């Protein structure tokens, strides 16, 4: 699908060039980039000048630190102080780190703009080489794409004081045997902001996938969905509450291997401006708590319960 999309894009670009000529097409490409740069610069101008620092930790203790310096319509984002690359696959390639930065900038703009390099023109980004946000080419990175990317967004929003932390994980769940494999991700609580409480049971930031309908899941696989509901009270308490996470219980009707890749099981989503943190997530098999990253052999009758994190709250409720 990706190859086909690229080929389609190349054909359409050839059609544009044939119709309007390279000078006109190149000029409009530049206009689009200039527009993105201008809108980003205007958004930065609305932020207070000065330095804004924040740090957070992954569940295994690895630190992600950032210092953002705002000067008028320009911004410097420096991840100095972030820990070195890890021995596991929670490292995020530089491209993923830059994607998280670009996402935050587009949120700042507050209106739809084409995704292009113009958004980054008013911004200087410094990422220490060899850190977990810019590891060497031989470093493992798969989980960094879906988990660490969330924490990068959290520290950027934390430094700018824009929102409390959202659930901060994709809650990746996979199971299967020699005949089938299934993969799903679960939403959780969104962080509250100065204007409104966080949404409940949603994917945030780097994730946007949906769960399979229970009827389809139970028809195709030896699985029974026992519970799928909001995790009431898991959002942080404050002037604006954080969103609630989810509870999902799956009963296995046959033996299978089960893996869970998740975060925010140790370090809770932070609150902002005196708001309380969201509840940490939990992974349980037959009532026994599992690690945040784990693979186990499940038997028929076993029940996997995933409780996803709530979002942090904004402001003191008093």
Predicted region positions:
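Glycine/proline-enriched, intrinsically flexible loops and inter-domain linkers
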Residues: 1-74, 80-318
């Amino acid at each position: 699908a990706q190859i086909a999309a690229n080929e389609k894009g190349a054909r359409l670009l050839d059609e544009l060039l044939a119709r309007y000529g390279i000078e006109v097409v190149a000029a409009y490409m530049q206009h689009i980039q200039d527009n993105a740069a201008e809108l980003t610069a205007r958004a930065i101008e609305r932020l207070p000048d000065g330095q804004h620092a924040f740090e957070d930790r992954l569940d295994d203790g690895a630190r992600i630190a950032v210092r953002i310096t705002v000067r008028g319509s320009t911004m410097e984002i420096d991840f100095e102080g972030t820990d070195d690359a890890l021995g596991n696959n929670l490292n995020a390639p530089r491209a993923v780190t830059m994607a998280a930065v670009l996402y935050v900038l587009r949120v700042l703009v507050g209106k739809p703009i084409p995704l292009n390099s113009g958004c980054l023109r008013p911004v200087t980004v410094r990422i220490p080489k060899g850190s977990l946000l810019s590891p060497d080419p031989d470093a493992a990175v798969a989980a960094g794409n879906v988990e660490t990317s969330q924490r990068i967004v959290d520290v950027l929003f934390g430094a700018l004081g824009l929102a409390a932390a959202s659930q901060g994980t994709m809650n990746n769940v996979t199971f299967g045997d020699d005949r089938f494999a299934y993969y799903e991700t679960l939403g959780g609580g969104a962080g509250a902001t100065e204007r409104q409480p966080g949404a409940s049971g949603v994917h945030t930031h780097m994730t946007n996938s949906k769960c399979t309908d229970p009827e389809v899941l139970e028809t195709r696989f030896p699985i029974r969905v026992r519970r799928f509901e909001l995790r009431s009270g898991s959002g942080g308490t404050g002037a604006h509450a954080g969103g609630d996470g989810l509870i999902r219980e799956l009963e296995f009707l046959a033996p299978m291997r089960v893996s869970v890749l998740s975060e925010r099981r140790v370090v809770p989503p932070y609150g902002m401006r005196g708001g309380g943190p969201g509840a940490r997530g939990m992974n349980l098999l037959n009532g026994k708590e599992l690690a945040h990253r784990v693979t186990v052999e499940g038997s028929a009758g076993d029940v996997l319960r995933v409780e996803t994190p709530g979002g942090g709250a904004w402001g003191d409720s008093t």
